[in-house]
UniProtKB/Swiss-Prot annotation:
Keywords: Acyltransferase, Amino-acid biosynthesis, Arginine biosynthesis, Autocatalytic cleavage, Cytoplasm, Multifunctional enzyme, Transferase. The gene is argJ. The lineage of its organism: Bacteria, Pseudomonadati, Pseudomonadota, Gammaproteobacteria, Pseudomonadales. Substrate binds at residues 152, 178, 189, 276, 400, 405. The keyword Cytoplasm applies. This is Arginine biosynthesis bifunctional protein ArgJ. InterPro entries: Arg_biosynth_ArgJ, ArgJ-like_dom_sf, ArgJ_beta_C. The keyword Transferase applies. Its EC number is 2.3.1.35, 2.3.1.1. Disulfide bonds: none annotated. It is an enzyme of class 2 (transferase).
Length: 405
């Protein structure tokens, strides 16, 4: 079940960015599993990619080509084309070469993306056979269909959109994402595509994508596994009648940054809310750190703990597991006598021990909720970080045990 995730909001079209969807039948006959995205000529494209050393063939190719004048993005689901060696790289090149042949652009202007089962050969002929249908389907109004087309174990499509005014001109930022398992992005299986009609220089766009990912996609985790295929792309078509943003300053940049960050946050949190088998959406706040890294270390140790995640699933306020996780997070010279821990607004541990006013009934009441905040005060400094995660349910085990059967 998706926690607090409803139907897609209105996804505003972005001038100069079109999406087309078709069926290649990679995993299931008739399923629409190929998505082609066309960027208007002159668009700038930025991206962040997985840091997994076993990165997939399409990631290798996309990283090489993202500096070029990108015109198309090609995504397939049902097959990750990862762990496939040189044949996998050749397969990714073949699919982009076919799309180049059909569109008249150079293959170096096409970025490939794949998601699905790792270690199986990419069905190149099936993908090639679906490309013309995807091209025929291209439309600026196809965001919702594309959000569905990139899904794998997701139960719901994920998207967000923002618009703002500047000098009488409306600027749009719209994005979609997919992911429900193998989620612990580190850039950043997860894919994200965000487009705007603002005109932005590539350097500014790349830094905007990095900052946006670090505050959203790189702060979510479901199971601690970093995918081989994670990518998040930001495209600026330049179709809005406003000057180019070539510096990270000024009112227009500030408005765009806020819109991009909000879209990133919405689609990143949607991945957590749709986590495989998730019944709880959990916010882990770590405050009072001596530096940001130790806040992240504590936050991720808590978020990844199987004992904490199963307690969350059982609605069991077993707060000792939280203390144990904080203690093993590797923070040097940690003074446990300064640590406070809260479940929601309920103080469960004060100065490293059970809070005098805490009762089991208070903790149980919080743990029964679908959305829970675990707040940890380290008492070491003024740095803070926030991680979003899920519980760990029987359904998560079932989904992943049966993934290939």
């Amino acid at each position: 079940m998706a926690v607090g995730l409803g139907p897609l909001p209105t996804l505003h079209p972005v001038a100069g960015f079109e999406l087309g969807i078709a069926s290649a039948g990679i995993k299931r006959p008739g399923r629409k599993d190929v998505v082609v995205m066309r960027c208007a000529e002159g668009s700038t494209v930025a991206g962040v990619f997985t840091l997994n050393a076993f990165c997939a063939a399409p990631v290798i190719l996309a990283k090489k080509r993202v500096q070029n004048a990108v015109r198309y993005l090609l995504t397939n689901t049902g097959n990750a084309n990862a762990g496939t060696g040189e044949p996998g790289l050749a397969a990714a090149e073949r699919t982009t070469a076919k799309l180049a042949e059909l569109t008249g652009v150079d293959a170096s202007q096409i970025l490939p993306y794949s998601t699905g089962v790792i270690g199986e050969p990419l069905p190149v002929e099936k993908i090639e056979g679906a490309l013309q249908a995807a091209l025929d389907d291209l439309s600026e109004n196809n965001w919702e269909a594309a959000a569905t087309g990139i899904m794998t174990t997701d139960t719901l499509p994920k998207g967000a959109s923002r618009q703002f005014q500047h000098d009488g001109v409306t600027i749009t930022v719209t994005g979609i994402s997919k992911g429900a398992g193998m989620i612990r992005p580190n850039m950043a299986t997860m894919l994200g595509y965000i487009a705007t009609d603002a005109k932005v220089s590539r350097d500014v766009l790349q830094n905007l994508m990095l900052d946006g990912a670090n505050k959203s996609f790189n702060r979510i985790t479901i199971d601690g596994d970093t995918s081989t295929n994670d990518c998040c792309m930001l495209i600026a078509t330049g179709k809005a009648a406003l000057p180019e943003i070539n510096r990270a300053e000024g009112e227009l940049f500030a408005k765009l940054k806020q819109a991009v960050f909000e879209v990133c946050m919405d689609v990143a949190q949607a991945i957590v809310r749709d986590g495989e088998g998730a019944t709880k959406f959990v916010t882990v706040e770590v405050n009072g750190g001596g530096n940001h890294q130790e806040c992240l270390d504590v936050g991720y140790t808590v978020a990844h703990s199987p004992l904490i995640k199963t307690a969350l699933f059982a609605s069991d306020p077993n707060w000792g597991r939280i203390l144990a996780a904080v203690g093993r997070a590797g923070v040097p010279d940690l003074d446990v006598s300064k640590i406070d821990v809260f479940l929601g607004e309920v103080c469960i541990a004060s100065r490293g021990a059970r809070a005098a006013t805490y009762t089991e009934a208070q903790g149980s009441a919080v743990m029964q909720q679908e959305e829970i905040t675990i707040r940890i005060e380290l008492g070491r400094g003024d740095c803070s970080e926030t991680i979003w995660t899920t519980d760990l349910s029987h359904e998560y085990v079932k989904i992943n045990a049966e993934y290939r059967t």
